[in-house]
Amino acid sequence: IIIKESSREMMPSHIGLSNFSIFFILPFYSKKASSPTKMGEIMNLGVPIICNSGVGDVDEVMKKSMPELLVKEFNNKEYESVIDIMLNDFKPNRKIIRQTSNNYYSLNNGVRKYLDIYNQILN
């Protein structure tokens, strides 16, 4: 495992070199309706993510692209299970990861969805 400080400008390059990205967000009530921006950015680079469930749409997005890497509980059994998958079985499908990112986080899709909502309200 290599942990390295990086400037904002170098983040895409460094993330793109990664085999995995990992982040955990405590699933507080305020996080139920949020979505981690970094998740879309990382997935758009085709990098598999290890993260926890219970935050915004994370569960749904992970189940579509890399369900094996979703940590459902903060305990050693879950961590060990994901580590075992990482080290032995997991072959990331970077194309699926990128497609899922595009489906959920694309600016064009977001603009279109908001436009549809506003049109429904106004009509």
Residue ranges and their predicted role:
Residues 2, 27-31, 67, 98-102:
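Conserved short-loop catalytic and cofactor-binding motifs
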Residues 3-6, 72:
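Short loop/edge segments at beta-strand edges and connector loops
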Residues 5-16, 21-43, 51-60:
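Nucleotide-sugar-dependent
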Residues 16-19, 83-91:
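Short, surface-exposed amphipathic charged segments that create phosphate/polyanion-binding patches used
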Residues 73-78, 88-120:
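A charged, aromatic-enriched C-terminal amphipathic alpha-helix characteristic of glycosyltransferases
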